[in-house]
Regions:
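Active-site-proximal loop/turn and secondary-structure-junction residues that shape catalytic pockets
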Residues: 209, 265-267
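C-terminal "post-core" interaction segments
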Residues: 229-231, 235-246, 250-258, 267-483
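Bacterial N-terminal signal peptides that target proteins for export
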Residues: 1-7
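Flexible loop residues that form catalytic
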Residues: 159, 264, 332
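Flexible, low-complexity junctional segments that flank or bridge functional domains
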Residues: 21-258, 273, 455-483
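C-terminal motif of bacterial Sec signal peptides marking the signal peptidase cleavage site
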Residues: 16-19
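Hydrophobic helical h-region of N-terminal Sec-dependent signal peptides
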Residues: 10-12
Length: 483
């Protein structure tokens, strides 16, 4: 799918709709400029357009009725929310932003962050008190400089014990003091007698603009006579696609036998980057269908009738492609969108061995829409910085599989234990060690009958984290005559 063509289509669609509201006598009612952009963007591209009556192409009889409708909403955010389909159950992900520069920075790997990546659990025997554990910290971040490490435990923020009612606002602050704790299992395998006690270690950290390298760790592991490429990849960011090629070139030169792709903490990102990574793992399926796309019926019908290839993304091939017939992928509940896409879309072609816990459950993708003539990032209205990031398509693999609302279940269940995290990339790190055993046909049964109740992770506080998106590319005038 070529987003240049898509944006040209949206431009023409918007112009056709706008022509219905021409006010030749110049006496039409004035409509909010930003609200006008919001409605037209959602009308043109929103995946669930057909489910929202206010987005119907024939919703308004004339420009006065349209303007009156728009002016009923005090803010663009109010209007946007009324156009979302089942916010709590179906569309949890479409967003509107009042500063598209911040959105662009996030999608390129830059965000306001302290570099602390964590999970939250209930305390043993509690349905109210909670604690956090550090999964990893970003290199060079405030958390890294403060020497916070994977496996550290915390129970409070700014001297206030964390509870199910307060953790949201306490961890949302730009600056806060973390109150750390010690975890003890009291030398038993019984979870209910475990304790998490404050230890008087308190560290203040601040969120800053941070460039996050999505490649957290990679290495070639020699294990039981096999060479295994290991990659922890924490966000699908197109700026790092060439870096992925370099890494896989190294794997290829090391003659790796297998790949362990660690997506435990990867909330998603660019569809194009998922295609690149899948093609680096394989390579033998060049031009085969990676995934197909299903848009709202207006857009879908247009492309089916004019250029069905638009709705297909295909595998690529690189000199560094490994041509593997299987891949081991590590997942948790934090693995979402593009992470799930690569699992789902590799399954029709190779053996995908998934280890960990069930993924998040997001199969829809979005695109950034700007207030410009064609919703591209060129000639944007200078009077405001609003942009939309609505869901515009759902993804299906080559076999038509989609709609994994409840996530993708692993073949081998394995959950991290906060008191035995290990170090990322170390062969003794529990989940990696278990996977290495599978690779060498040594399957150890893991007893995990009693586990903590997971609540949330740091992505809760990152508005854009679980986006899966297509890039908004520059429109070239040479393409405008394609329609």
């Amino acid at each position: 799918m070529n987003s240049k063509f898509f944006l040209v289509y949206l431009s023409l669609f918007s112009l056709l709709f706008s022509s219905c509201f021409e006010d030749n006598d110049d006496n039409g009612a004035f409509a909010s400029e930003i609200n006008d952009f919001v409605w037209k963007g959602m009308n043109a591209a929103y995946l669930y357009k057909q489910e929202i009556s206010d987005l119907d192409n024939n919703r308004f009889n004339d420009s006065d009725e349209y303007a009156s409708y728009l002016n009923n909403f005090i803010t663009p955010e109010n209007l946007f929310e009324t156009l979302i389909y089942e916010r709590e159950n179906i569309d949890k992900f479409s967003i509107i932003v009042n500063n598209y520069i911040e959105l662009e920075e996030y999608l390129s790997g830059i965000s306001l962050s302290n570099g602390l990546n964590f999970g939250l659990y209930y305390l043993p025997n509690s349905s109210n008190e909670i604690f956090g554990y550090v999964r990893y910290v970003n290199q060079g971040s405030p958390a890294d400089l403060a020497e916070i490490e994977r496996g550290d435990i915390f129970r409070g923020i700014d001297g206030i014990p964390l509870t199910i009612d307060n953790y949201d606002y306490l961890l949302s602050e730009e600056t806060y003091t973390i109150n750390f704790a010690d975890y003890s299992n009291n030398n038993t395998d019984i979870l209910n007698d475990d304790t998490v006690e404050f230890n008087n270690i308190n560290i203040e950290i601040q969120k800053v603009p941070l460039i996050k390298n999505p490649v957290h760790h990679y290495s070639t592991i020699d294990y039981s006579g096999k060479k295994i490429g290991y990659l922890m990849y924490n966000q699908f960011v197109s700026n790092y696609d060439e870096y992925l090629e370099t890494i896989f070139s190294e794997f290829k030169s090391n003659s790796v036998d297998d790949i362990v792709l660690d997506l435990r903490y990867n909330p998603g990102g660019s569809i194009n980057s998922a295609i690149v990574l899948a093609s680096l793992i394989t390579g033998q399926f060049e031009n085969e269908i990676f995934n197909t796309e299903e848009w709202n019926s207006d857009i879908q019908n247009y492309w089916i009738n004019n250029d069905p290839e638009f709705l297909i993304n295909r595998f690529l091939s690189f000199q560094s492609s490994l041509n593997l017939n299987r891949v081991f992928i590590l997942t948790t509940r934090s693995s979402a969108s593009a992470s799930e896409l690569i699992i789902n879309c590799l399954k029709p072609y190779i053996n995908v061995i998934q280890i960990g816990t069930t993924t998040y459950g997001k199969y829809q993708a979005s695109v950034t829409l700007y207030d410009s003539g064609n919703f591209s990032n060129q000639n944007v209205n200078p009077s405001h910085n609003y942009a939309l990031q609505p869901l515009v398509l759902k993804t299906l693999n080559a076999n038509g599989v989609s709609d994994y609302f409840n996530g993708i279940n692993p073949e081998y269940e394995f959950e991290e234990r906060v008191f035995d995290m290990g170090q990322i990339g170390d062969v003794n790190e529990p989940m990696l060690n278990y996977t290495l055993g599978l690779i060498n046909s040594r399957i150890d049964l893991v007893s995990q009958t009693e586990l903590f109740r997971f609540i949330d992770d740091n992505f809760k506080f990152d508005f854009f984290a679980r986006e899966m998106y297509i890039e908004n590319e520059v429109i070239l005038k040479t393409y405008e005559n394609q329609f």
